[in-house]
Amino acid sequence: MSALRQIAFYGKGGIGKSTTSQNTLAALVEMGQRILIVGCDPKADSTRLILNTKLQDTVLHLAAEAGSVEDLDVADVVKIGYKGIKCTESGGPEPGVGCAGRGVITAINFLEENGAYDDLDYVSYDVLGDVVCGGFAMPIRENKAQEIYIVMSGEMMALYAANNIAKGILKYAHTGGVRLGGLICNERQTDKEVELAEALAGRLGCRLIHFVPRDNGVQHAELRRQTVIQYAPDSKQAGEYRTLATKIHNNSGQGVVPTPITMEDLEEMLMEFGIMKSDEEALAELEAKESAAAN
């Protein structure tokens, strides 16, 4: 039996992280891999496309109903989805009350202690990445996830979040085995997107694992609560996700300790690509507009 691989998909909210991870995992299960998904996002949408359902009941919600997490069985919180993929959602508290990361910690500890990680090839954590606070960093900090894949795009805030996540990985890389597996660029059709993604990967010392092209078929599948792999298995987009899955499967042991950059370096990189103007250029442009308006 091969060693259990614990991977995690991090990325800023709205980047398509959960969609990318679920399509990739659907492709991996077709390759004969045994998988457990642990959703670590308060939206609890990390398993929706695998289960073909609205939202899965979360560990925190079920624990509150039962009285405590100790009153639950694994069967209560782990549901079986597409081709046998096991799914669970950690959940979070009501908005404005408590720490959402607490659900992550509670769920992972419960699953480990109750044998949910037995007889698996992959455990995949789907984690919110706008903030790398204690709870959301738990899969990294506690050496649960060994390979981190950052889902990003050519948009500035996605690049900024990716660099921040790399900082979080670096913080714990030397005390545990966590490594940056690479970047996954989810196309947003911004200027020079592939080049920017490759440039950031170079700065972080990792690889751009795959560039996932934008395709309307993804939305069509999501409306039916399915992955593209299930909804349109013979489509070109399904092929893209299978390629990504194969690359991740072959990337075992290839992770790196990242070399995150400063905000100034990130802005400089954006200016090099003409995505962002320098203060001098912005000021000159403003003065030119004011001068034209005055005349």
Curated annotation (Swiss-Prot):
Keyword ATP-binding found: yes
Binding site for ATP: 11-18
Function: The key enzymatic reactions in nitrogen fixation are catalyzed by the nitrogenase complex, which has 2 components: the iron protein and the molybdenum-iron protein.
Record organism: Rhodospirillum rubrum
PTM remark: The reversible ADP-ribosylation of Arg-102 inactivates the nitrogenase reductase and regulates nitrogenase activity.
Protein name: Nitrogenase iron protein
Gene it is expressed from: nifH
The protein's required cofactors: [4Fe-4S] cluster
Keyword Iron-sulfur applies: yes
